[in-house]
Amino acid sequence: MKKLLATILALVMALGVTTMAWAEGDWTGSGTEADPYMITTEAGLNKLATDVNSGTVYSGKYFKLGKSITVTDWTPIGQKGTENKFAGTFDGNGQTVTINRINSSLDSAFGGYAGFFGAVKDATIKNLTVAGTINGSDVAGVVARLDGASKVINCINKAKVTGTSKAAGITVKIDGANVVIEGCTNDGEIKSDTVNGAAGIVVYAQGENFTINGCTNNGKISGPFVGGVVFNVSDSGSGIVKNCVNNGSVHSTNAGQNIMTAGIVSVNLKGSGLKIVNCSNTGVIEGENCSAICYSEYTNDASEPNTNSGEIKATVSRTISESTAVLNGDMSIGLTIHPYAAVTINSGNYSGSIESKGSLTVDGGTFIAGGNFYSSGTLVINNGTFARGVSVQTGTATINEGAFKTDVSCADNGKLTINGGKFAREIHASDTSTVNINGGEFTFNTNTNEVIDIKAGAKVTISNGVFAQENTNRFCPNNKDRLTVTGGTFVSDAMVTALMGEPINAPQATVVNGDKTMIAVGSAAIADAANSGKKVTITKGGEKIGRASCRERV
């Protein structure tokens, strides 16, 4: 009996000690993966912060949150600029830490970086939700700074985060190599008061080989420099952003500083060092220079397209960075099309400059004078009215129809094919470009300029088309040896002789169009004239053709 009483007393004392330890902020568990340190109180969280900030970083140790906890005057876990960075694994266990206030008196000691975690290195933070209000300099909901090969997995920020410098839902800065942020969501409102940036997931990514995968921003992002998922990938950063979504409104409040704003990554200084795949924007993007996915160029995998269904409210210029887009409305701002984007313009009035590095199809629209129209990708024009020059700089372009009131040019190693359309000014070919004219109506008639302008190295071939030029000396005054004419409809025998010489071996015919007589050379030109209802009489290389029988090519 005495032994039994002694045993019971020992158990009671042990339970009493355990209860006291919990009250003092200690944890249960041994810190292994199978038996992690279990934290269930504010005091327990404070103990972790105190230990890490004093140099005990718990490398290789495991922690689990046993219940949701509210903290006040919170001291972040880990410090920027020191070795006092959490290095273990923290499992939030689906629980929520609500932060009522960050201890602002510690701002300088933490280098301005604050959140639930201030700084971690080679750590894993997972399954954690942060709520409440977070204010400070460089602040985030979950972890302000990621060093080493840290991981943030399946974390959610619901806190309102306001930074006097930078603000993020998940992390302010990726500074280590091989950092992974996966399955994270921002539902909180994120605001930055300065030009240093705000974003739903990450403000600055400057570590090498980072991965941001399956993350979503649902919160409102506002400030001078902002991004939906990521604000800035620096020139020292590299990695991939994939399977991410921005559903929140992203509003740049700055004006006059040429600011870039986008739903997924606003600024990419790394160029091809950043890959964005299978991402989408549904939110409203508002600012000076806006894009759905990324304002800067990046690397894309065509098999994993990026998409946009959100409204883009740009005041200066818009970049189309999603994989496909259709434009129907008026646009007074500049438009840039990225190399991996395929865009169709169906209608609208466009007064801003257009630069296409991707695939652009124009099925209609009016392109007002004063802006540029450059293509260095793939361009197809099926219709439209162009009161500005069209310039093919590299790549390929095909014009099937449309009204061109000023010059069309091809440069560098570009290739331009003209199958139709009405052209009121010159056709220019320079550098090592190639221009093939297979049709179209060329109404330009000049005694001072030129219809076809060829610079050394370029080549122009004419197989068809109707040309109004009368002065034989001004049709192609430069580099005539680079011009080949095998057919077409011209104003006189003199034009035909000047372009092709005598004798003309191809079929030749007179074409009467109203009170005007022209000379058609070649089967294609004769058939086109006949099929358009004009009176055609073969004069060389064939027999007389009546209008009723002119539906076949000769």
Regions flagged by a language model, labelled:
Residues 7, 38-40, 218, 382, ...:
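A general, composition-driven signal for non-globular sequence regions
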Residues 18, 22-347, 352-358, 362-364, ...:
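Surface-exposed repetitive/solenoidal architectures
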